[in-house]
Amino acid sequence: MNIKELELNFKKNIFRNEDDIKIHFHSDIVKPLLIELNPDMLNQYKSEDVLISGGRTDATFQNISFELKKENYFSKEKGINEALYGRNELDHGLYDYIISNAGINVNDKDEIIIKKIMRGIGVGFDGKKFVFARFIASPQKNRLDTSKVKLKIDNPLNLDFIYEVKEFQPGLKRLALLLKQQEKCTLNKSTLCSVIHPKSEFVRKSIYLIYQNLRKN
């Protein structure tokens, strides 16, 4: 995958607003990366995904939640904070999306909740820079803010919320690694059908191997 070529193709566009960023982020960055690195998961990228536990992401891909902003929005700390935590008490940010997208059940024990939340990743993008956010294990217990999501986590958990800002090219390389992942895909009807279907490269290769083995025997 030629990362530099992806960068050049993306930057050829004119970005008048946030919607332009969203459109070309998918068409010029995410889609080519998935076709090259993870084609069987191409239809797992969902734009404006409404999460069951609250919030509507600009997009999701498996355990990754995206928050896309207008060009150069992350040039100021205020823009980064908005991507992370939302504009106000009613607006969601990556912090909320990671929790909401974790698939937490009301009967989950603390250790299960921790594992689920730590699998989540938040990615912000403003056409210039990337913001990568996640929860990591912490020796200190902290109470999570779930005021914006439709679930309640009563107990403080051994988790810390961290983020880092990366320039375009190193951020794009990090994104490529994240999109390549498959081991963190939730095992459910939706994700299974996205991999196991007649047009899937995985299915075609598997059938061919079975056919070859049957011929030999």
Predicted features, each with a name:
Residues 1-121, 129-216:
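A short, conserved, highly charged catalytic patch centered on acidic carboxylates
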